[in-house]
Amino acid sequence: MPVFALIDEPVFPSPHLAEPGGLLAVGGDLSVARLLAAYRRGIFPWYDDESPILWWSPDPRPILVPGHVRVSKRLERTIRSGKFTVTLDTDFAGVIRGCAAVPRDADNGTWIVPDMIEGYERLHAAGHAHSVEAWQNGELVGGAYGVAIGKAFFGESMFHRATDASKVAFVTLCRFLDRHEFRFIDCQQATGHLLRFGAVQVRRNEFLRRLEAAREEEGMVGKWVLPRTTRCASPQPTSESSPSAKQ
């Protein structure tokens, strides 16, 4: 299959035309319009600072139904202990930079390059990209971010600086998405971590079928907020050390 060079307009070729490894197109930009057009078709950017923007549509594709997330007894005890305060859309910039700081290969490189950070921050400002944060003693110690299109959520990356912080954040996000009837989380890559949480591999045709239905449902554009009763927390941090005071 050919790899398509994108034009100035925010349009994409059919994801069915991707190479066997999932690569579909090259070029373009990370404008809000182009990112939304990509995610609506199940396409996402993934590249490093030595390559142009690369756009992917893998086959198969790992997805997780939020209501089917598997949580071990030990992790459930940690969630209930109040060890972490969990919030949504409180420090998107901190989360995406925390994810970017995590080494992804033997060369300590990252695929979350500065242009990508800026692109997703614009998408967040437009109300389409969201973060979940785990706090401990007023410090950001873990989290994840992704993109919501209708009732589909596309998980991008997560990080942790304290044991179980990203896991608690992720489970809390899953339960929030389930409560709001999201159909699935696109995990993009099948890692052992996500498979243990209950992610399953589906073929591209099945993924796109699910996405076509989910994207037409009424979504949740704008800032997301967790009900206080689901924040997995002991008393909230004081105003001097609260997440909101850190921005």
Curated annotation (Swiss-Prot):
MF terms from GO for this chain are: leucyl-tRNA--protein transferase activity
Determine the domain of life of the protein's source: Bacteria
Provide an example Pfam family for this protein. Leu_Phe_trans
Supply the alphabetized keyword list: Acyltransferase, Cytoplasm, Transferase
Query: Which coarse location class applies to the principal site listed for this UniProt protein?
Result: cytoplasm
Q: Which of the seven top EC classes does this enzyme belong to?
A: transferase
One GO cellular-component annotation of the UniProt record comes to:
cytoplasm
What this protein catalyses is:
N-terminal L-lysyl-[protein] + L-leucyl-tRNA(Leu) = N-terminal L-leucyl-L-lysyl-[protein] + tRNA(Leu) + H(+); N-terminal L-arginyl-[protein] + L-leucyl-tRNA(Leu) = N-terminal L-leucyl-L-arginyl-[protein] + tRNA(Leu) + H(+); L-phenylalanyl-tRNA(Phe) + an N-terminal L-alpha-aminoacyl-[protein] = an N-terminal L-phenylalanyl-L-alpha-aminoacyl-[protein] + tRNA(Phe)
Please state where this protein is localized: Cytoplasm
Listed EC numbers: 2.3.2.6
GO biological process annotations for this chain's record? protein catabolic process
State its role.
Functions in the N-end rule pathway of protein degradation where it conjugates Leu, Phe and, less efficiently, Met from aminoacyl-tRNAs to the N-termini of proteins containing an N-terminal arginine or lysine.
Which family, according to the similarity comment? Belongs to the L/F-transferase family.
HAMAP family (UniProt xref): Leu_Phe_trans
Protein's UniProt name = Leucyl/phenylalanyl-tRNA--protein transferase
Gene designation? aat
